[in-house]
Amino acid sequence: MPVPYQIIPEHVYPHQHVQINDNTEVRTTYSNISSEVTALLCVFASPKGRDNKVLTIEEGSQGFVNEYGIGPFSLYGQPLLNAYNAAMSGACTLHCMRVTPEDASYSNVTLIAKYKIEESEAGDDGQTTKNLKVMYYAKSSNKDLATLDDLDVCCTVSGDPDEEGFTSVKLLTVGCQGKGIYGKNLRFRITSDRTSDKDNDFKNYYFGVYDSSNGMIQKEQFNVVFNSEATYSNVSLFAEDVINDSISGSTQVKIASFDAGFKALYDAYMIANPACTLSCVEFDPFFGLDKNTRTALPNITIVPDAAASPAGAGETAIAVSSTEGVALLGGSDGSLAADADPQARANALNKLYLNAYNGILDPQIKSKNRFPTTFIMDANFPKEVKLAIANLAVKRGDCMAMLDCGTGITMKASVKAYVDETFGSSVSNRVITIEPYCMKVRDPFTSKAVTVTSTYWLSGRYPAHIQEWNGKHRPLAGNTFGIIDGYVRDSVYPVFDEDLDSNLMDELAEAHINFAKYNANQVVVRAMQDTKQVKQTNLSEQNNTLILLDIKRDCERLCASYEYDFSEPTDIARFNTDVEVIAARYRDAQVRSINAYFDKNSWEAERNILHLYVELVHKDLVKITIIEIDVNRSTTES
């Protein structure tokens, strides 16, 4: 029922204020003998990938592996395995953040040209001929590239002629989008785009990106022009704009292109061939071809890499169109290197995980609008990170945090003590659950058995469960719906048995801790789905809370669409029609009943507030059954 007092919005700027009235609290009594797509928010270290920012992966396991790869459990631990298992379910969207340390660096390479104008001896007519000679080199950066913002300054050239009279200019720098040594596997290749040459007034190229870790596999290709003024039909063709575009650009590399270098080559060619009628944007410095006639330009020689002069320090002669591509150089994993001290590496990882979930690495992790989320799974993190996950879920208000109890519990009786010591009362919220069991599974990279916590299974199983039942209304718990699978036989621990552990099971149930148990078929199941809120209400059940969060999200989005709309009676009638569509989505299928309507009182009307009332009743669950058997004496009639 609506609250008996005026609701005061939290802010004065236009927004949606949500008030949840939980009218389902149950006063505990004791017997004498006592619509949404499922999305996971994951943070991990991985062999490759864009780093320290949240990215959405919607292409399932293939998209996940293409972006982040998969590595040994011994190096990357459970966080990567959880995310991979969720991706393998094929039933969820992943919001992922790959963490890398500050002392790691990006692989990169700078393409430089060395040129000089040579004059031939005078002929019989007394005239000399000038020829532009150009050689291309891949040059490493002067220092480690710690940020892609330094892509345009990480490599320098002197600009003065060398001993042979060649002047060096930078043409472009290509940098991997993620830190780490994996960037050395990336290569680029530049070839002529003759088709586009016919369509516009620029010299066009194909810029291809390749991965050489398992043969030369083309990852991307772009149509580009190496001139910042190049536009066609109001669309920029400039290589930087095309490749660095956050939506349609490269997911592998970023580039910095230097107009000054290309202009220097053009100016030198005009000295060698003053009769040339091509403009700077039409000139082809890489292949020396006339874009209009496709014939070789006079007075220019592109020296093959095999015939180029000896390279300077950090330089390698290359051909930009080589089928082997131009390899990126350098890059490091920093304190997360595979050969780093294991304890120091673990400490660095834990600090990164804490900073990630606290929103220090990427504040967008806190945004429910940018990255709407269903679950944030623990992954055998230390206490501080577990608490950060719980705080993040509470602050976001759109998802549930599912926390494990590590892999070190050796006695059933110590489960509650671990929870009390680790969490205390700091996680007493309906968006948090505690899952204290662990198991052995096969590492998909090495096929070795490794020990993981409950959240590995939950990461893959919960999205699949929601997909199978077409909604979040079906609990993932109990003897039929909560069967734990996918583990090495007899490896789940601790597992409770009501014939042996009934007192402990009562203790855990009263503390809202979701333990694993054997059922009558000797199958291990998730026995409960309690949230960690203190009072006993309908929202003590995880499925009910998940439905509530979905309804809340739908209502927020609907109300947001009405900002600065009118709220006359005819408008409110229209709004009520819209909200009924949302209510109908949940009615009967996921909840017993739901009603929603817009209204406003005089106080709210004076302040331009529109009030949405939602009333819902969850479906009843079967958790306890009473079996009453009467054994009666037979009667004999005379």
Stretch-by-stretch model annotation:
Residues S105-T110, E118-M135, K139-T147, C154, ...:
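Intrinsically disordered, low-complexity serine/threonine-rich repeat tracts
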Residues F64-V65, Y106-S107, T195-Y206, V224-A256, ...:
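Short, surface-exposed linear segments at secondary-structure transitions and domain or protein termini
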Residues M1-T110, G123-K130, E282, D290, ...:
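Structured, hydrophobic secondary-structure cores that serve as assembly/anchoring elements
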Residues S120, D124-T129, K133, Y137-V242, ...:
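Extended, beta-strand-rich, solvent-exposed assembly scaffolds of outer structural proteins
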Residues N21, E58, M97, I112, ...:
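A structural detector for beta-sheet-dominated domains
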Residues H11-Y13, D197-N200, S213-G215, Y232-S233, ...:
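Long, low-complexity, intrinsically disordered terminal regions
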Residues S233-G312:
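Low-complexity, serine/threonine/proline-enriched polar segments
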Residues L94, V153-C155, K184-S192, V253, ...:
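Generic structural motif
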